[in-house]
UniProtKB/Swiss-Prot annotation:
It comes from Clostridium botulinum (strain Loch Maree / Type A3). CDD domains: SfsA-like_bacterial (cd22359). GO terms for molecular function: DNA binding. This is Sugar fermentation stimulation protein homolog. It comes from the Bacteria. The lineage of its organism: Bacteria, Bacillati, Bacillota, Clostridia, Eubacteriales. Belongs to the SfsA family. Transmembrane segments: none annotated.
């Protein structure tokens, strides 16, 4: 998907809270919005180069969103709104092999007390619920989720098991918001409960998928499947 708004580079200064950061643009310090509540400590390092998206909304306190950052030569998208958009584009273009037969794609649909990112249906009425998780944590080609404890994420995984137990299809797709990685694994040290829930989900037949992305400063798209170790 293309990012149609104005894109520019800046120098990262600091992040005083989850939603705000300070950057240097043309020698001027400016506060920007961070559209990611994760820690992103390995990306948002003082002095590093980050990518901003200009919003031009007079009702906002900040003019820019901080949407990506360079980790060395590697560009990593950190915008938490991006994964669902990328996966939706991939589903519409039948790029996810095991989901190609699901032609009816609905977003943000409820099952029981749960809300999942996608509800997919085949022509014969077969239903599949898909949850998407964005991944930004990487170390030497190994990617992990989460980068902060996530009770909500664990809840989603357990709810997918419930979907599967009721005879429907269920899956979680980890969208790795960078390119050229080797493997994905749950971050057991950060959130043991999430890792255990994911292992149980696999045992119960929930599909566990991971894809990396082709990331450029003004575009991002689904790339290739990534091996998973749970």
């Amino acid at each position: 998907m293309k990012i149609t708004k104005n894109i520019l580079k800046a120098e990262f200064i600091k992040r005083p809270n989850r939603f705000q950061a300070y950057v240097k643009i043309n020698e001027k310090i400016e506060m920007v919005h961070v559209p990611n509540t994760g820690r992103c400590k390995e990306i948002l390092i003082p002095g590093s180069t980050v990518i901003l998206r200009e919003e031009n909304n007079e009702n906002r306190k900040t003019r820019y969103d901080l949407i990506a950052g360079y980790k060395g030569d590697m560009l990593i998208s950190i915008d938490s709104q991006i994964p669902n958009k990328v996966v939706y584009e991939a589903l519409m273009n039948f790029k996810i092999e095991i989901l190609k037969e699901y032609a009816n794609i609905k977003r943000e649909k409820t099952f029981g007390k749960s809300r999942f990112d996608f509800k997919l249906e085949k022509e014969n009425g077969e239903v599949y619920y898909l949850e998407v998780k964005g991944v930004t944590l990487e170390n030497d080609g190994l990617t992990m989720f989460p980068d902060a404890p996530t009770e909500r994420g664990t809840k989603h995984i357990l709810e997918l098991i419930d979907v599967k137990n009721k005879g429907m299809g269920a899956g979680v797709l980890f969208l790795i918001q960078l390119n050229g990685v080797k493997k994905f694994t749950p971050n057991h040290k950060m959130d043991k409960n999430f890792g255990e829930a994911l292992r149980l989900a696999k045992e119960k037949g929930v599909d566990i998928l991971a894809y990396d992305c082709l990331v450029e400063e003004s575009s991002i798209s689904l790339n290739n499947p990534v091996s998973i170790e749970i």
